[in-house]
Amino acid sequence: MNRFHISGPKNLSGEIKISGSKNAALPILLTSLLISEPIKLKNVPKLTDIMYAIKILTKLGVKIKVEKKVLYIDAKTIAICTIPDYLTKKTRASIWILGPLLARFGQAKISLPGGCKIGKRKIDLHLSGLKKLGANIAIKNNYIIGSVITKLIGNTIVLPIASVGATITIMSAATIATGITIINNAAREPEIIDVANFLNKLGAKIIGAGSKNIFITGVLKLHGGSYTIMPDRIETGTFLVAAAISNGSIICHNTKPNVLINLTKKLCETGAQIKTGTNWISLNMKGIYSKAINIKTAPYPGFPTDMQAIFSLLNLVSHGNSIVTETIFENRFSYVSELKKMGAKAQIKNNSLFCYGVKKLYSATVFASDLRSCASLILAGCIADGTTIVKNIHYIKRGYERFQEKLQSIGAKICN
């Protein structure tokens, strides 16, 4: 059934092992097309978006073996360079296959990508970046059709906005292009560093990932090897907030505290007690009535847009009023009307959410409309009085591995 029945309120406390990062695993998996030798990817989360990416690669002729959290990939031989819409419409990440196909094979035909419906999320920057590397690209009958006469050629590309997706597309395509490519105003997200580390381990020459300027010296080819995907910082943040909203205490293991400073700093401002180690973060909110604080999403190292819906829930059940400003995507407050059904008090004005804290939420039947709103509504159900029904839970499986089981392990009462 595409719904959860959640009984609350429950105190969410315990220990969680964080899974591999969805936002790193997807581009790394798809850029494996650049490599003709066998690859071993470890710590790959079991998610529907990963499954769709595997189906796309398999359709192209890539051989993939799955063993728990490990993928064995052999892209030595590609049968076709065309991806039909029934595959690309399932995940927006499918756009990341365009660069590797053009760089290695000189041709590509993919249907326009799908994914969560959050704002416009244009692909213009991906296409313009590839054009500056020498690709010929046109859109016909809902398909992106690309070709390269000989090889992609390095160039200096200035991104008008620091797009994560476009940075990854250009960086991956440039690894086996001729000459040097410079990406100015590149996105700085940790997942971009992870993609660069993966490519560098297999022979790429990328310098500056994680800064505003990335330099890529094209190499003739990449070689095979093994790589471990970084932990998921958004999953970590989600479970930290889960404990915070329920006056709980949690330890998140197998994570990277240094890439979560933008979030943990804000959690401390709410009153949470945060401790960190080399690969763990703990939060204690027992006996503490959280304070509502203002947040504003921004490209990394700013506050992550993927945490906006989840942190807003904390504001809505905290003491005082606050303003949440969304600067990355349009239409990312779809969850607010659903939380209002549960007793939340909020008002949307343009790209800002005005939160008026309440002490308690109440059960209701609510509908998720994207991945992060689904997580927010599920967490709301965990602390609401009564039994909440969250529908459209298929979204949660796109970005959280074993979310139901992990929540149950820290005290949530959830069933289908």
Swiss-Prot record:
A single cellular component GO annotation: cytoplasm
Compartments where found: Cytoplasm
GO biological process: cell division; cell wall organization; peptidoglycan biosynthetic process; regulation of cell shape; UDP-N-acetylgalactosamine biosynthetic process
Enzyme class: transferase
Pathway where it operates: Cell wall biogenesis; peptidoglycan biosynthesis
Positions bound to phosphoenolpyruvate: 22-23
Sorted UniProt keywords: Cell cycle, Cell division, Cell shape, Cell wall biogenesis/degradation, Cytoplasm, Peptidoglycan synthesis, Pyruvate, Transferase
Gene3D superfamilies for the chain: Enolpyruvate transferase domain
Binding-site residues for UDP-N-acetyl-alpha-D-glucosamine, renumbered to this chain: 92, 306, 328
Residues with the 2-(S-cysteinyl)pyruvic acid O-phosphothioketal modification: 116
Reaction equation(s) it catalyzes: phosphoenolpyruvate + UDP-N-acetyl-alpha-D-glucosamine = UDP-N-acetyl-3-O-(1-carboxyvinyl)-alpha-D-glucosamine + phosphate
Domain of life: Bacteria
Main localization of the protein described in the UniProt heading: cytoplasm
Active site: 116 (proton donor)
GO molecular function, one term: UDP-N-acetylglucosamine 1-carboxyvinyltransferase activity
NCBIfam families found in the cross-reference section: murA (TIGR01072), PRK09369.1 (NF006873)
Family statement: Belongs to the EPSP synthase family. MurA subfamily.
Cited function: Cell wall formation. Adds enolpyruvyl to UDP-N-acetylglucosamine.
Protein's UniProt name: UDP-N-acetylglucosamine 1-carboxyvinyltransferase
Species of the source: Buchnera aphidicola subsp. Baizongia pistaciae (strain Bp)
